[in-house]
Structure formats: structure tokens, C-alpha cells
């Protein structure tokens, strides 16, 4: 059924059509003001499902830890050693992992040495040993690290007494019922590959990735991780955003108390150390990915594949964006300039 675009949608579609060029094959976006859809636009070559990349960190990992905190399973003083007593650096606080201030190495090419013939659960045991030995040099400043969120996955397993896939499935069923959010176990897509936005021509997998997670380490782990791995639609991403909005505004059905959501979404480290709440990005003074108009109370996150979600509680404005900007190669950074402009266009058009 054809739907009529609003004037905002018409204008935004024209702006995007003129802008995407060699930036990305397509963009899917949805904006909510006051919890109501005010903009729903698809431009270019778009598909139903997208690789969420690091949005996994908020849709899964941060949300699971926030809910665990809400039920009293850990405190702001809790350390890795409280849950993983054999870990080599037991005094790292969970809050340091959430704010990327632990000092753990930002990234390591685990995919180059992991035995991919092992079942994914055995690969996780191997990964734990690698994290034990990973470099860790705290500086007092935030250094974005995938390894910190990988470690949080083992904390979640200990908190729940279940493997990571079961932890994810429980969260999905309780917090996102009816969603199509999925991790691709053993890197097997749950839908026909044509339904997925293709990402990069991978030099070592020697094929165009479609329905396979773009992140090399997550792929080598069997598609299951806490730093990347989720696939979903714009309905799924916006659904998460509305769930977060309900938590922050204390609305009926929210999965955590408003006081917990307020704690996790406020600035957690000094500005000179970085722009982080507990698991969420905050708008930077210069070059914020949410553009120039979102308030300092806004929270969000981005994904390497060209995804993002930002919510401004002062404007009560939620913007969800999916793209496959890595299709032409990960070195194409043009989307990093387009994304804040999209947020500016939306705010200026309302």
C-alpha cells in the first residue's frame, strides 16, 4: 500500500537523494517526536535487515547490565573479580568497562589466530584466555575498546549463570518481544540473504558479506558477542529506542526504574576524560554524530557499518538510522559527515 509522505519526509528524502552519492548505497531512517513517528524515510538501495555492528553494545550489553543493576545484581563499585575471580585484572570496575576507561587494548585481531573449527562455546573459552593476557594501560581517559565489551560478555554469563546466547535470547524475549532482532549463530542468516543489506567485499573471507556479520572478530567467534553481532530492521532499532525512552521517562512497562535509567544515561566521567555515560555516547562539543541541535542530555551510539541511534530527552526526539556505508570499503568515511547533517535536517524540519 502506498503511503503519502509528509512535507518533512519529502524534503528529507530529496536532501538524502542528493547527498548519498558514493557515501552509501542507501539509508533507512525513522524519527519519533513525543513517541510518535514524524519521519519514516528510505532512500537508495535499501533492504529489510541491517548489520547493527556496535549498536549491539547498547541494544544488548548495556541494556542487560542496566537491568541487572536495577534488580540489585551489581553496584557501581562492582569489579570484574566479583564475578570472574580468576581474571587477571580483577580490580577493573564494571563502570570502567562501560565508559571505556579500563585501559584495555582497543582492538586485537583475534580472528587471525582463533580455531574456527571449534564450537562457538569453546571459542569463547579461548577468547577468555586472550583477554586475560591482553594489554591494559589505564590513562584516566576514555579509549573506545571492543575488548572491554567482550569482557562484559563473560560478566553477563556469570551474572545469569547461562551462556551468552541464552542471555541474549532472554533479554530479547523479555524486552523486545516480537522483534526480529537476531544474532546469526555459526554465522548462518535467519532470513534469505537477499533480505540483508550487503556490506563489504571482505578480503580474507573472499566474498561480499550479506547476512554475515561484518565485524571480523565477531564472525570468528561464531557470530555471537557483546560488542557486535546483532542484525535487525528499522522497526527493531526504533523499538529499542522507544523502550529506552520509556525507561528514561518512567513510562508504564519500562524494564527498569526511571532512577536507574537516569543514573545510566547521565555523564559518568569528566568531559576532559571523554563523552560517556554508562555504556552510551554523549554529544561531543565538536563533531557530535547527532549534529548541532541535540541537547547535552542526549544519549546514543553509532555502529561501524553506518548505523546509529540518538535520543534527546529534552526534545523528546528519537532518531534511528540504518545504512551499509561500508559497502564501498571501510575506508570510506564520508558517512561520518552525512550522519550529523541528517540529524540537523530533522531538527530543523520539525
What residue spans do the PLM features occupy?
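Short, P/G- and charge-enriched loop/turn segments at secondary-structure junctions
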Residues: 15-19, 266, 294-299, 306
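Active-site SXXK
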Residues: 13-16, 51-76, 152-157, 237-240, ...
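A short, well-structured edge-of-sheet supersecondary motif
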Residues: 15-52, 73-76, 108, 113-116, ...
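Short, gly/Ser/Thr-rich active-site loops of penicillin-recognizing serine hydrolases
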Residues: 246, 260, 265-268, 285, ...
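Short, surface-exposed loop or secondary-structure junction motifs
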Residues: 90-296
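Glycine-rich phosphate/pyrophosphate-binding beta-alpha loops
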Residues: 223-229, 296-310, 324-329
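Short active-site loop at a secondary-structure junction
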Residues: 21-28, 43-97, 135-147, 225-228
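Hydrophobic (often cysteine-bearing) scaffold residues that line and stabilize catalytic clefts
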Residues: 8, 12, 52, 56-57, ...
Amino acid at each position: 500500500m502506498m503511503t503519502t509522505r509528509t512535507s518533512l519526509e519529502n524534503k528529507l528524502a530529496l536532501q538524502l537523494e542528493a547527498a548519498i552519492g558514493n557515501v552509501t548505497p542507501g539509508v533507512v531512517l525513522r524519527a519519533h517526536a513525543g513517541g510518535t513517528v514524524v519521519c519514516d524515510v528510505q532512500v537508495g538501495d535499501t533492504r529489510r535487515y541491517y548489520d547493527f555492528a556496535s549498536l549491539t553494545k547498547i541494544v544488548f550489553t548495556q541494556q542487560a547490565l542496566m537491568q541487572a543493576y536495577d534488580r540489585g545484581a551489581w553496584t557501581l563499585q562492582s569489579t570484574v573479580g566479583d564475578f570472574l575471580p580468576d581474571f587477571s585484572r580483577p580490580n577493573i570496575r564494571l563502570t570502567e568497562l562501560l565508559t571505556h576507561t579500563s585501559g584495555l587494548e582497543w582492538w586485537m585481531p583475534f580472528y587471525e589466530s582463533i580455531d574456527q573449527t571449534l564450537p562457538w562455546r569453546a571459542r569463547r573459552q579461548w577468547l577468555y584466555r586472550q583477554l586475560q593476557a591482553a594489554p591494559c594501560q589505564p590513562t584516566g581517559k576514555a579509549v573506545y575498546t571492543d575488548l572491554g565489551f567482550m569482557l562484559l560478555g563473560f560478566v553477563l554469563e556469570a551474572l545469569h549463570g547461562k551462556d551468552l546466547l541464552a542471555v541474549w535470547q532472554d533479554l530479547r524475549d523479555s524486552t523486545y518481544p516480537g522483534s526480529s532482532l537476531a544474532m546469526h549463530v555459526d554465522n548462518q542468516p535467519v532470513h534469505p540473504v537477499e533480505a540483508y543489506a550487503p556490506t563489504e567485499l571482505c578480503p580474507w573471507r573472499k566474498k561480499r558479506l550479506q547476512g554475515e556479520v561484518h565485524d571480523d572478530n565477531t564472525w570468528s567467534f561464531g557470530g555471537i558477542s557483546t560488542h557486535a553481532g546483532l542484525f535487525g530492521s528499522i522497526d527493531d532499532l526504533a523499538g529499542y529506542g522507544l523502550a529506552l525512552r520509556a525507561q528514561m521517562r518512567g513510562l508504564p512497562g519500562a524494564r527498569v526504574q526511571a532512577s536507574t535509567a537516569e543514573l545510566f544515561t547521565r555523564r559518568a566521567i569528566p568531559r576532559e576524560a571523554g563523552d560517556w555515560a554508562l555504556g552510551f555516547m554523549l554529544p561531543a562539543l565538536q563533531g557530535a554524530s547527532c549534529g548541532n541541535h541535540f541537547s547535552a542530555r542526549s544519549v546514543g551510539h553509532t555502529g561501524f557499518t553506518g548505523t546509529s541511534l540518538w535520543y534527546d530527552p529534552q526534545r523528546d526526539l528519537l532518531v534511528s538510522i540504518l545504512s551499509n556505508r561500508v559497502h564501498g570499503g571501510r575506508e570510506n568515511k564520508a558517512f561520518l559527515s552525512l550522519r550529523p547533517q541528517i540529524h540537523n535536517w530533522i531538527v530543523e524540519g520539525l
